[in-house]
A protein has these predicted regions:
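Flexible, solvent-exposed loop segments that connect beta-strands
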Residues: 34-41, 71-90, 118-139, 168-184
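Bacterial Sec-dependent N-terminal signal peptides
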Residues: 1-26, 193, 197
Length: 197
């Protein structure tokens, strides 16, 4: 977590009212799954909250940096019927992205996110499973994403985004690897409102 302090200082020290800079707040919902956990579907709902700053690079192109708290993982809606545990993960994420303004109301985006794990647990029907009985999660999750923005008005933007880890969040239970499949990966579909300050 020590690495977050200088990033936080830089993030919030930028004057968002300077020429070509903007910024705002983020509030939304994440839905996620973890590949390789025997559970399918974006069944895990979580909180997505944070802030952003952006820089107008050209008439149609913006660079943007965000800092968010996001919940990821997987959910087993049939836990009483099978023995598969699900996963709860919380991260502080730093997405870096480019936004292309396709029209007055639509923008498309793509980028990379580095997320730092702040809490993790495997869960069964009785609650959290002891950390001594589970495999350890990696402390950093790196993912790539694409998304779309719809401008509701001059202050409010609806953002939808899909992302996938490019490095495993932890090894498979067996420790095996399969070519590009090196372990378990986060997949996230998120929906958020961006309020421009």
């Amino acid at each position: 977590m020590k690495i977050l302090l200088p990033i936080l200082i830089c993030f919030f020290s930028i004057n968002i009212h300077a020429q070509n800079f903007g910024g705002g707040l983020i509030l939304g919902l994440s839905t996620s799954q973890v590949s390789g956990d025997h559970l399918g579907g974006f069944n895990k709902a979580g909180l997505l909250v944070g802030g952003f700053i952006d820089l107008q690079l050209s008439k149609t192109l913006k660079g943007q940096m965000e800092m968010t708290f996001i919940q990821k993982g997987s959910n087993n809606p049939n836990m009483n019927e099978n023995s598969y545990s699900d996963i709860s993960l919380s991260y502080v994420g730093i997405p870096l992205l480019l936004k292309y303004q396709q029209s007055s109301t639509i923008a498309i985006e793509g980028g990379i996110e580095t997320a730092f794990l702040i809490s993790a647990s495997d869960n069964d029907v009785y609650g959290k499973i002891s950390a001594n009985s589970t495999r350890e999660f990696n402390t950093v999750d790196i993912s790539i994403f694409i998304g779309m923005n719809y401008s509701i008005n001059s202050k409010l933007i609806l953002n939808s985004r899909i992302s996938n880890s490019i490095i495993p969040i932890r090894d498979h239970a067996s420790g095996a690897t399969f070519k590009l499949n090196k372990g378990q990966y986060n997949s996230v579909l998120s929906f958020a409102l961006h309020y421009i300050i």
